Design a protein with these regions (language model features):
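Sec/Tat signal peptide C-region and signal peptidase I cleavage site
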Residues: 18-23
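Acidic/His- and Gly-rich active-site-bordering loop/insert found
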Residues: 24-130, 135-156
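Histidine/acidic-residue-rich, glycine-tolerant segments that coordinate divalent metal ions
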Residues: 82, 117-129, 135-136, 147-271, ...
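Divalent metal-coordination and catalytic microenvironments
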Residues: 44, 83, 95, 134, ...
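Soluble non-cytosolic domains of exported or imported proteins
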Residues: 31-35, 48-59, 131, 135, ...
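Metal-dependent amide/peptide-bond hydrolase catalytic core
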Residues: 244-436
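Bacterial N-terminal signal peptides
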Residues: 5-17
Length: 436
């Protein structure tokens, strides 16, 4: 009789559904944890680190995850890490946060503003700032980790929390995959990531069911001329003049070769050439960023840039052995595009948990890019959702006085955006790993 009762109890227990985490419970738990998260955010903001130099950030993240019961693997692509929490059978999920700062001198006015100086990979000492919100991303990841660790009766499966280096250089995700990330943790069933966005009101959640960000490629053109005296230009080939002609000709690719209905961008961000006013140098360099919303346009732009550079030099009489050298960085990244079905599931979960008014419609106002696709575009691709969290008080948006990303003036409403980010990401995780 006792055996029968025990078996019946076990069967009944196994068949009971996992009770969902009520919205009020989650928001109250995040509120109770915010003092800790605020201290972490201030620490990360005041101590930014350049790409692939995120040693202290990575170690602090690892320590926080280990304290919550996560198994942490360090040193994936130098400073990358992954913290794993297993909770029975079920799907596996990657949640990624990027960690690096930018070579920007902070002028935000925050009492915990960065005064950090770091030597970059060229050996130059630079000011460093979290001018894109990656401090918020790491803090949010830690907040999500606590909610998952404290509510293991509400989900099942495996969660891998990834601290990724070098997003700003568009090589960190690719480097982690190349360094064996998925050999270490296995191929996940889903992947999620978020980004705080200054153009949206703080606390709002924005989820696209398709395109999120453009592709990005970096191109360097080395224009080679023939050096001569500045008073005798006819005896040489002036790479500065040829470079200037190339700069202008590149703009015609976008305006005259690509459909006006297709977004495309070629920006020459740097032009270096010459050493003195009376010297015509033997070379000049152009550094270019290239953006597109489709792979077809992306490849067309890259091919067209090389064609324009070479043919412009030929038209100037440059010999075949001195034609421009066009280098395309291997750290380019494709478009960030959400899985439509997964995005709808995440949107529904966020709407149900945070209210319909928490969601805003996605729109594209610029051609920003991300390297998250390099984390998920393996063979076969991992279904993924990348969503945005508003970061600026509405009154600052209305007055136009907010600091844009990568600006010395950049700052967010950290409390509102972190709480919203933790709640939305936890709800998304419960949706993908929960059981009805």
């Amino acid at each position: 009789m006792k055996t029968t009762i025990l078996i019946t109890y076990v069967i009944a227990t196994i068949s009971l559904p996992i009770s969902p985490l009520r919205a009020s419970e989650l928001s109250d738990a995040i509120e109770a944890d915010y003092g800790r998260l605020d201290a972490l955010f201030r620490h990360f903001h005041a101590n930014p680190e350049l790409s692939l130099q995120e040693f202290e950030t990575s170690e602090r993240l690892a320590t926080e995850l280990e304290a919550l019961g996560f198994e942490v693997r360090r040193n994936i692509n130098e400073t990358g890490l992954v913290g794993t929490l297993r909770n029975g059978d079920g799907p596996s999920l990657v949640i990624r946060a990027d960690m690096d700062g930018l070579p920007v001198r902070e002028d935000s006015g925050l009492e915990y503003a960065s005064t950090v100086m770091q030597v970059n990979k060229e050996g130059i000492e630079m000011p460093v700032m979290h001018a894109c919100g990656h401090d918020m991303h790491v803090t949010t990841l830690i907040g999500v980790a606590k909610q998952l660790a404290n509510n293991k009766d509400k989900w099942q499966g495996t969660v891998h929390l990834v601290g990724q280096p070098a997003e700003e250089e568009l090589g960190g995700a690719k480097g982690m995959v190349a360094d064996g990330l998925y050999e270490k943790i296995g191929r996940p069933d889903f992947a999620l990531a978020l980004h705080v966005i200054a153009k949206y009101p703080a606390g709002k959640i924005i989820i696209s069911d398709g395109l999120v960000y453009s592709s990005a490629d970096t191109v360097r053109i080395t224009v080679r001329g023939v050096a001569t005296h500045g008073a005798a230009p006819h005896r040489g080939k002036d790479p500065v003049v040829i470079g200037a002609q190339i700069v202008l000709a590149l703009q015609s690719i976008v305006t005259r070769e690509v459909s006006p209905m297709e977004p495309a961008l070629i920006t020459v961000g740097a032009f270096r050439g010459g050493t003195a006013p009376n010297v015509i140098a033997d070379h000049a360099q152009l550094d270019i960023t290239v953006r597109a919303n489709t792979e077809r346009t992306r490849h067309y732009l890259l091919e067209a840039i090389e064609r324009v550079a070479v043919q412009t030099a030929r038209a100037a009489g440059v010999s075949e052995d001195r034609l421009p050298i066009v280098d395309i960085s291997p750290n380019g990244s494709p478009t960030t595009t959400n899985d439509a079905g997964l995005a709808r599931r995440v949107s529904s979960a966020v709407s149900a948990g945070m209210g319909e008014d928490a969601l805003l419609e996605w729109y594209q106002s610029d051609m920003g890019a991300e390297d998250f696709p390099d984390l998920v575009n393996i063979d076969p691709p991992i279904p993924s959702v990348y969503f945005e969290v508003g970061g600026t008080p509405p009154e600052l948006i209305e007055s136009g006085t907010w600091g844009p990303h990568h600006s010395p003036l950049f700052k967010i409403d950290s409390e509102t955006s972190i709480k919203a980010g933790v709640e939305a990401m936890t709800l998304a995780t419960m949706e993908l790993l929960g059981r009805s």
